[in-house]
Structure formats: C-alpha cells, structure tokens
A protein has these predicted regions:
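A recurrent domain-boundary module in secreted/ectodomain proteins
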Residues: 22-23, 291-316, 585-610
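Catalytic grooves of carbohydrate-active enzymes
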Residues: 254-272, 338-365, 375, 431-434, ...
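Short, charged/polar "capping" segments at the starts of alpha-helices
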Residues: 277-280, 378, 547-550
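Substrate-binding cleft of extracellular glycoside hydrolase catalytic domains
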Residues: 371-437
C-alpha cells in the first residue's frame, strides 16, 4: 500500500492511500547518493513575514465577554434581531479598536454556535468573563470606557446602516436603530452622529479621510456581519446594492470604483453581495488590483484574526512523486471540489461528512481547493485544523489566489505588470510556507493572452509550485482540458491544466462537457478510447446535489431529487470509468503529465529528492 507522510515538527504521520507500493523514506539510505538530494516532504519555507500578510492585524486583549443574541439578521423588534446584532457588532468593533489603540484590554466574542467557532473560541488566550446581552454589556465599566455615545441609523433607510458603520469608528460610538434609541439614552449614552438619512455615497464623501485604505468591507444592507471588523480597523464600509437582495433600486458601482482606486493595491475586500451576478462586483475588485474575499456570513473576525502573524502552524500533506508509478499506460482523471475560495463556507458546514470529512474522499482521491492565504490571516487556527484533518490521498490547492479574482483582468485598471508580480509573490509565500504545491486560478477566458501572462507571473514567483489548474468563470470547463506550459525561475517546465469536465446539476439537460456523474464518466471514457494518454481534470460543483441511481447509466436521472454532494457523486462517476482510466489526486495528475511531456527533465528532477 502506498503511504504519504506529513511532517509536522517532531511528528510524522503516515497513512495508506492507494494500492501502489510506498516505503517511508529513510534519510540514511540516501547519504551516499551521487546526486545530493533532500527529503521531498521538507521542501517548504519556514513561517516568516515576507510581505504576504495583507490583512490588517488585530491586537489581542487580556479578557473577553461573550455577547448572546448577536448573530441574527432578522429584521424584527425582538431581543435577538438585526437591531441587537448591530449594537453587538459595534461593541465588538469598538472594544477591539480600543485594544488596537492601547485604550483597553477587554474584547467581546459573539456567541456563534458552530463547532468551528467553539473550537476557535477555545484557542483564545484571554480570560473568559462570561456571557452577557448587549444591554448588560452597555452597563459594564470596561465596555463603557470604549464607547463615546451612539450613531443613529434607520432600518427603513437601508443604506444608513453602512454609513453608521463608518461613523461608528470615527465617533467611537455604537450603532443604534431609531427603535432602540430611547433605551440606549436611558443607559446614559448620547447621540454623537445622525446617520439615519445617510448613504454609502455620503459616508464616502464625508469620512474617507478618516478611514484606513488597507482593506474594505463590502456587505449587503440589512446585515450586521463584519461591521465589527470594519470598526476595529477604521475601514470604509459599503453596500453594492442600495436595497437588500435587489437591483431594482440601483447600486453603488460608481462609488465602489472610486473606493477601489483609493485602496492600497492588493488590499482584501471582505464580504459579498446578494441577488446579483457575482461577476458584476467581483470584476470591479479584480480590475482594480485588489482581492475579493468571499466572507459575508462571518462572526468574530477581529478575534479569530488577532495576532495572526505569530500564529502560523500546520502544513499540507503532499504526494511524493518519487513513489508514483510512472509505468502506467492508462489515462488519468482527477476530481477537485469547487468554491474553495469561499472563506465563510469554511466555518459554515464545510468540515463535515458532506464535504471535507466525506467517507468517499479516500476512494475518489478528490482534491480540495482551500483559501489557504486568507485563512492564514483571518482564521489561522481553523486552517491548522483543516490541514491536520486532511486525508493524505486528497491534494490541497490554494484556490483563487488570496481571494476571488480573475487572473486575466487582474489589475487591468492599474499597474498590471507590477501588481501581478507582487500578488504572485504574496500568494507564493503563503503557499511555500504551508507546503501547498498547486495553485487554482479563475479566469474569464483561460486561453487568452492575458491569462497566460498571469500564469507566467505566478509560476515565476514560486519555484515550489508543481502546477496550476485554471477554471473559467463560465463555463467552468470552458478550457476543454487544454494545457499550457511555462518555465519557472529554475527553467523547469510547469503545466497549467484547464478544467476538461464539470460534474454539475444542470436540471433537465447536460452541456457539452458539464453534467451528471454518469454523463461525465461517459465523456471521460470516450476520450480515453481515442488516446491512451489523456489527462482529465474534473471540477465537482460544490453546490450541485445528485441522487443515487445505482448501476443505471441514465445520463440525466441523477439530477432529480438530489441529496448527495462532493466526493459521493464523484465516486459514482469513478465507478463508471473503464479500466484504462486511473483516478489520481491532482498532484499525481500533474506529475504524470510532466513525466509524459518532459520525461528527461522530470526524471532528473526526481533525483534531487527522495
């Protein structure tokens, strides 16, 4: 049985992953090699700040309160509603800001109940003072000393919430809806600013000189999420749609363009927008030379990111190419799960039996795109957990490149050549320090000259990168499996493999290269019948559900009443593949391709490690 090893300081973890032979390398057996070689698993960089840390860094206090009834965006008048969440988020932000400015030592944690948040709370090196409501917190001395008053907003004027968020850090005041104003006044707080008739545009005009330009929060109206982070770091905060989940009332695209041009290049834009073609706003961010970070339904970002630069632990498990069977005469297929750029997904039903801990992960050798760069700064403890729970047969991919952007138009409205190189270095440093060997990139057109310019930039900045996978925005499999080659800084040929097929529930039909597990299996078999050396990279759409139709080869039936996701539908596809198609993880797919295309170069490279 083949074993892959993961080296954590002073720890080697071995696990069975395939039916090929593998023996754990013994360094003493290689001490007399004619060519000096090193252990492949040791090919990574030590953790260090090499300019890759682009998220504003929060200081950590000495104690914290847990605020209850603080995660609801329900627009009603209860004590567990958006109105109380606004107060809670502003308390979270103002106490964190006070810690950052050495005016306080007390912080506040929102009582999010998922297992991921519970685990991250357990890692907080602060004293837990207990639970309290927002009203109880507002009467505590260590909280009051961080608050100078309140900023008034009006839920009936949705954009006032965004304006109030910016005003909150300018005036060091909590956000209060008109409904709760009297109650807050009764506690002794006075109004410092009236944002009840303000908009995102007026907030930008009035407060831009009071905001830091090293990040931006972009969130829908009528939500409280991420307001605390914006306040803690004195950031601009904007909604794209002027009304929640509606384009009918207009948008703030022109204001967004101004803000994005004002931002320091390569800044994270944290959040998302609802009920709009994502390409509309993501492309604005991408063209500006900044990174959209899908992170809307998050809580506690000030605390989960605190002191992140000193909290880097954990490496990806990698496939050692010295122990790959390169004598196979089969075609190869490799599955990877999409949407790994989505940071909020990582704390909302990702590390479970449906996805990351699916029992079918081992047999399918499915690869996982993860937001490695962003988790390293936003939730380093969660990233440590994800890497520790990685199944050794499943490759890890840095998915998106420190966010969701389109590589072929990244920084097209800015200094593209310079920013591409800097962004590639940022991504490369994160990857090398986490021992992640594959980069996944999104493009509008994966075959365009601009895309190839970007591929070269990322490959040139990372000499530990073994390959790139490229996904087209629409359709994901628009690259048709085309492969491009580029030389890295050492003159080694590195492939860029475009997605050939996609397992995607399209309803009552399949497209030319996207569809049900049965359909994709038929396409892989058809291709393998024409050429014994084929390399099929298959995207498994994260949000597509399928039904189990057993041994039937019906090409549409799996789309009906689906309840299975991720590796499980991929396993049905795999079971239908002919014997001349071998399923491998994405690292092995890349190495097999490199050996086939550049055999002498690859053989020579393999002698340099064991």
């Amino acid at each position: 049985m083949k074993k892959y090893i993961m080296i954590i300081p002073f720890l080697i973890v071995a696990a069975l992953t395939s039916c090929d032979s593998y023996v754990t390398p013994d360094p003493t057996a290689h001490k007399n090699d004619s060519i000096k070689s090193v252990l492949y698993m040791n090919q990574y960089d030590q953790f260090a700040n090499k300019g890759q840390y682009n998220l504003p860094e929060q200081k950590l206090g000495t104690k914290y309160w847990v605020v209850v009834n603080s995660t609801s965006n329900t627009n009603d008048y209860s004590d567990n509603s958006l109105r109380t969440s606004l107060i809670a988020e502003s308390i979270i932000g103002l106490t964190a800001l006070a810690v950052n400015e050495d005016r306080g030592t007390t912080m506040v944690w929102s009582d999010a109940t998922s297992s991921e948040y519970i685990a991250m709370q357990g890692n907080l090196s602060m004293t837990n003072e207990g639970k309290a409501s927002v009203w109880e917190l507002l009467e505590k001395t260590d909280i009051r000393q961080c608050i100078k008053g309140y900023v008034l907003c009006n839920m009936l004027k949705q954009e006032s919430l965004a304006a109030a968020t910016v005003a909150a850090h300018v005036y060091q005041s909590i956000i209060v809806d008109t409904y709760n104003e009297a109650k807050v006044k009764a506690l002794g707080y006075t109004k410092t600013y009236d944002a009840s008739s303000k908009t995102s545009a007026t907030a930008w005009t009035e407060f831009k000189d009071s905001c830091n330009n090293n990040a931006l929060v972009l969130m829908p109206t009528l939500t409280a999420n991420n307001k605390g982070f914006a306040i803690a770091h004195k950031l601009m905060f904007i909604n794209y749609n002027k009304k929640y989940a509606s384009t009918a009332s207009g948008d703030n695209s022109s204001v967004c363009k101004e803000i994005l041009a004002w931002l320091k290049p390569l800044s994270p834009v944290i959040g998302w927008e609802q009920n709009i073609d994502e390409h509309t706003f993501v492309d604005l961010v991408s063209q500006s030379g900044n990174m959209m970070v899908p992170a809307d339904w998050l809580y506690n970002l000030p605390l989960t990111s605190a002191n992140y630069s000193g909290n880097q632990i954990g490496l990806a498990t990698v496939t050692n190419p010295r122990y790959i069977n390169f004598s196979d005469t089969t075609s190869y297929a490799s599955f990877f799960l999409t949407d790994g750029d989505n940071v909020q997904w990582m704390v909302n039903s990702f590390e479970n039996s449906k996805y990351y801990l699916n029992n079918d992960n081992l047999t399918t050798k499915i690869s996982f795109g993860l937001p490695i760069c962003n988790l390293a700064t936003m939730m380093p403890n969660l990233l440590t957990s994800l890497l520790a729970n990685q199944a050794p047969s499943n490759s890890i991919i840095e998915y998106g490149g420190a966010g969701y952007m389109y590589a072929d138009d990244f920084a097209s409205n800015a200094d593209r050549t310079n920013l591409l190189a800097k962004h590639a270095a940022l991504v490369g440093n994160h990857m090398k320090q986490r021992r992640v060997k594959i980069l996944g990139l999104f493009c509008n057109d994966v075959s365009s000259a601009a895309a190839q310019e970007a591929y070269q930039a990322y490959i040139s900045q990372n000499d530990q990168l073994i390959g790139v996978i490229a996904v087209q925005y629409d359709p994901y499999a628009g690259g048709n499996g085309n492969i491009f080659w580029f030389k890295n800084s050492n003159g080694i040929n590195i492939p860029v493999i475009t997605t050939r097929y996609s397992i995607w529930n399209l309803g009552n039909s399949n497209s030319s290269n996207q569809g049900t597990p049965a359909f994709v299996a038929s396409k892989i078999n058809e291709l393998a019948a024409t050429d014994k050396s084929t390399y099929s990279l298959v995207a498994v759409h994260a949000w597509s559900a399928f039904s189990d139709i057993g041994s039937s080869n019906d090409l549409i039936a799996e789309n009906t009443n689906g309840s299975y996701y991720s590796a499980t539908p991929a396993s049905w596809c795999m079971k239908r593949l002919n014997s001349n198609v071998k399923v491998v993880n994405t690292e092995e797919l890349i190495w097999q391709l490199r050996m086939k295309t550049y055999p002498e170069e690859t053989k020579s490279l393999l002698t340099t490690f064991y």
